[in-house]
């Protein structure tokens, strides 16, 4: 009897295993990424305080912009894609040139698709290649794939450091190769994908290859009321960081009752303790006020013992007297520099980001900022441009923020997904409250038991999109509310 039961179980399980193994990542809701770095707050690395206070990345030797002209091939069906295009020596010289960032539909490849509730593909999650009615655009273009290739020269000062490859936005799923070696996979069209490519790069010339799928299982969570466009549509760049480095930090402030004093808390998470060479580090947090006026002393400093592994974030606190408060009416910003040095005093990296002292709370059935009740006068904003689609320029974002201020709008909801990181910087600087919304919308599946929010196998995909948004944007003073999604 036991043998019969085991054989029966085996017969039931084997087809499931075979099906799982035969599913590509872009049709598997349980695989949202492979080898992608954990989400982190937005920061940029510099070599000195002087560089960092300018916020001019062109001065940083630890930043390499990969925007520009890439070789590009487009097909309408995955079976037609150039399967081995990432291999060294593969001839892409005859391919088209495509500017990155951009949406390929606006460059003559395929057709932009607009729909609201109804999915532009068959509603049979997680599958994307199921047949659709003849009137669907997807009937003509089942699942276009864009293959991107470009070369880059690794800067000499990246040597003996970690190299991170950062994609700020790619729709909807992608595979990445460096020098012919597969690096990883990522979904979620509205948040960054970052990969540690240290072991894949070499001195001199390198080749980066990216394969982008227009539709994936992730598309089931991206059923917003908008135009669907695809490709590498936000910035791509390389960052150089020390072998052991401050990977993520969270700055928080609490206040005494009259706001005359703030307690600043830093939660610092480090990475790179697997290195054979153990580094002892000194870390300093500096604050710069208006006109880059530096506060006289480091807010706090602490040491990192290279012989230890720090699994939990390190927490440090400091008292700040009479901080200038941030609000939409008076957006006072401080420039935060976090300096990492080795024991010999050599600066290994300076990380730069803005910070605002403010307190948000709900009491007496009202929303309060810095001890004063406020009234929301808000709009919804899609991150889109009439000419460039998803590849929204900094100038276009600035025009939106200026219009908000001119019309006395004090709040924007990033409907219905996280926007470009630069947009939050503008809201910080100009004074716009932000309701930050996760890239979760699946109303094409309805709201009953069939809703993907009720399906256990989709839980990780939902939660990761929410958490990764929060991790990226947690230090922006403009973000006063989190939205877990829309119509999902």
What are these regions (language model features)?
Residues 21-65, 69-71, 78:
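N-terminal pre-domain segments of enzymes
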Residues 158-161, 201-205, 319-333:
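Short glycine/proline/serine/threonine-rich loop/turn segments at secondary-structure transition edges
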Residues 25, 37, 56, 73-75, ...:
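Accessory beta-strand-rich segments of carbohydrate-active enzymes
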Residues 214-220, 341-348:
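Short acidic/polar inter-strand loop motif in beta-rich domains
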Residues 1-23:
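Bacterial Sec-dependent N-terminal signal peptides
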Residues 102-154, 158-166, 171-177, 184, ...:
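Active-site-adjacent substrate/metal-binding segments within catalytic domains
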Residues 178, 261-303, 314:
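Beta-strand-rich binding/interaction modules
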Residues 209-211, 335-339:
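Extracellular recognition modules
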């Amino acid at each position: 009897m036991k043998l019969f039961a085991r054989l029966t179980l085996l017969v039931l399980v084997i087809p499931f295993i075979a099906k799982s193994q035969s599913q590509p990542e872009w049709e598997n809701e349980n695989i949202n990424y492979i080898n992608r770095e954990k989400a982190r707050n937005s920061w940029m690395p510099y070599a000195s305080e002087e560089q960092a206070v300018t916020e001019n990345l062109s001065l940083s030797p630890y930043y390499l912009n990969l925007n520009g002209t890439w070789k590009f091939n487009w097909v309408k069906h995955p079976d037609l894609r150039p399967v081995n295009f990432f291999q060294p020596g593969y001839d892409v010289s005859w391919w088209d040139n495509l500017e990155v960032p951009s949406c390929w539909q606006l460059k003559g490849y395929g057709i932009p698709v607009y729909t609201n509730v109804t999915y532009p593909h068959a509603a049979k999650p997680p599958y994307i290649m199921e047949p659709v009615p003849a009137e669907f655009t997807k009937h003509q273009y089942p699942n276009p794939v864009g293959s991107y290739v470009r070369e880059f020269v690794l800067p000499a000062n990246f040597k003996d450091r970690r190299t991170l490859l950062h994609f700020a936005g790619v729709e909807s799923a992608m595979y990445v190769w460096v020098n012919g070696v597969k690096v990883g996979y990522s979904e979620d069209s509205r948040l960054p994908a970052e990969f540690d490519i240290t072991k894949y790069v070499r001195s001199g010339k390198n080749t980066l290859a990216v394969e982008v799928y227009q539709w994936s299982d992730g598309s089931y969570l991206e059923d917003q009321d908008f135009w669907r466009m695809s490709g590498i549509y936000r910035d791509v760049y390389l960052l150089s960081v020390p072998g052991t480095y401050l990977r993520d930090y969270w700055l928080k402030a609490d206040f005494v009752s009259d706001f005359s004093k703030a307690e600043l808390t830093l939660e610092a998470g480090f990475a790179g303790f697997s290195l054979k060479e153990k580094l002892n580090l000194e870390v300093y947090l500096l604050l710069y006020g208006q006109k880059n006026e530096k506060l006289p002393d480091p807010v706090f400093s602490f040491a990192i013992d290279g012989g230890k592994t720090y699994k939990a974030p390190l927490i440090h606190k400091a008292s700040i007297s009479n901080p200038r408060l941030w609000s939409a009416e008076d957006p006072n910003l401080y420039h935060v520099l976090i300096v990492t040095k080795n024991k010999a005093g050599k600066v290994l990296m300076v990380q730069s980001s803005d910070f605002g002292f403010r307190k948000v709370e709900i009491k007496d059935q009202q929303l309060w900022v810095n001890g004063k009740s406020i009234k929301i006068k808000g709009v919804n904003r899609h991150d889109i441009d009439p000419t460039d689609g998803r590849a929204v320029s900094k100038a276009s974002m600035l025009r939106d923020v200026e219009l908000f201020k001119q019309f006395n709008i004090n709040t924007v909801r990033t409907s219905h997904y996280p926007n470009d990181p630069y947009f939050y910087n503008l809201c910080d600087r100009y004074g716009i409250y932000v309701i930050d919304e996760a890239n979760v919308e699946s109303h094409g599946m309805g709201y009953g038991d069939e809703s993907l929010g009720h399906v256990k196998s989709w839980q990780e995909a939902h939660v990761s999109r929410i958490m990764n948004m929060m991790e990226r944007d947690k230090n922006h003073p403009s973000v006063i509310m989190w939205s877990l999604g829309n119509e999902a």
